[in-house]
Amino acid sequence: VRVDALQAQADGILNQWTASPVANLGNLAAWEAVSDEDEATAINAPNVGLRQSFDVEPLPVMATPAIYGVQLTMLARKTDAGLGKVKGLVVSGAQSAVSTDIILQEQLAWQSTLFERNPNGNVQWTEAAFNAAEFGVESA
């Protein structure tokens, strides 16, 4: 079994969250805010149901491709009072799917969710389908 960690490389088709740069960083793209490994930059959503998707790096070429699932991992926290929740998001073709609610804490913590099947047809993931899909987050 092989696990590949692939990062966002561009904003996807769903861009409802706001990138929050600090100081004079200019207009930071959402994908840059989540990929720079810096807590000073982030994305946030003021309302429930907002979606942000990202184009991720392509899978390395596989001799005998077999994808048993896609694990979406995010570093997240809540920033205001009350219950903070998000959902993992995958967009594949004209179909999308979200995970169950992920409860957030006040401190940054790694969260992950698993998409075992491609929502576009409810079929096993293929290399081509993965490379064409977008992954992200929905405010809950």
Segments and roles (model prediction):
Residues 1-140:
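Disulfide-rich extracellular domains of secreted proteins
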